[in-house]
Swiss-Prot record:
It comes from Rickettsia japonica (strain ATCC VR-1363 / YH). Pfam families: 17kDa_Anti_2, Rick_17kDa_Anti. Residues 1-19 form the signal peptide. Belongs to the rickettsiale 17 kDa surface antigen family. Its main location: membrane. It is a lipid-anchor. The lineage of its organism: Bacteria, Pseudomonadati, Pseudomonadota, Alphaproteobacteria, Rickettsiales. InterPro entries: Anti_2, Gly_zipper_2TM_dom, Surface_antigen_Rickettsia. It is found in: Cell outer membrane. This is 17 kDa surface antigen. The keyword Membrane applies. It comes from the Bacteria. Keywords: Cell outer membrane, Lipoprotein, Membrane, Palmitate, Signal. GO terms for cellular component: cell outer membrane. A lipid is attached at residue 20 (S-diacylglycerol cysteine).
Length: 159
C-alpha cells in the first residue's frame, strides 16, 4: 500500500478517535501526537528486517509522537491547509532550490517548501525531493521527503 494511502487511513482513524472524545474533540497537540506517532511508526517500518524493523517502528513511533505533538500544539487546520496547498504548488511549478512560502495571517505561523532534485522513479513517474520547513510560535522545524506526481496531477508523498 502506498505511503499516502496509509497516511490517509491514519488521518481517518485519528478523526474517528477525536469523534469518540466527545464535544470539542481532541486538542491539536493530541492530534499531532497521534498522527506523528502513527506516521513515525509507518516510516520506521520501512527500514530493516525482523527485529531491526520492530526497533525502527518503535523508534519512529516515539520520535514521531514527540515531534507531532510539538508541531500539532501550534498548527491549526488553516495552517495544515495552507501547507498542503503550498506543497502541491511548489512541487508542480517551483524551480529546484527555491522556497515557496505560506503564511497564516490569523496566528502568524508560516512555512515554506523547497523542492530539490527532480527524477523519474522505476515506474516512470516524475518525483521530487523536497524540504518542508514550518515555524510555529517562533520555533522552526524541518522535514525532508520525496513525492511523486500522480496521473491526476497531485503530488503524493512516498517517504
Amino acid at each position: 500500500m502506498k505511503l499516502l494511502s496509509k497516511i490517509m487511513i491514519i488521518a481517518l482513524a485519528t478523526s474517528m478517535l477525536q469523534a469518540c472524545n466527545g464535544p470539542g474533540g481532541m486538542n491539536k497537540q493530541g492530534t499531532g501526537t497521534l498522527l506523528g506517532g502513527a506516521g513515525g511508526a509507518l516510516l520506521g517500518s520501512q527500514f530493516g528486517k525482523g527485529t531491526g524493523q520492530l526497533v525502527g517502528v518503535g523508534v519512529g513511533a516515539l520520535l514521531g509522537a514527540v515531534l507531532g505533538g510539538q508541531i500539532g500544539a501550534g498548527m491549526d487546520e488553516q495552517d495544515r491547509r495552507l501547507a498542503e496547498l503550498t506543497s502541491q504548488r511548489a512541487l508542480e511549478t517551483a524551480p529546484s532550490g527555491s522556497n515557496v512560502e505560506w503564511r497564516n495571517p490569523d496566528n502568524g505561523n508560516y512555512g515554506y517548501v523547497t523542492p530539490n532534485k527532480t527524477y523519474r522513479n522505476s515506474t516512470g513517474q516524475y518525483c521530487r525531493e523536497y524540504t518542508q520547513t514550518v515555524v510555529i510560535g517562533g520555533k522552526q522545524q524541518k522535514a525532508y521527503g520525496n513525492a511523486c506526481r500522480q496521473p491526476d496531477g497531485q503530488w503524493q508523498v512516498v517517504n
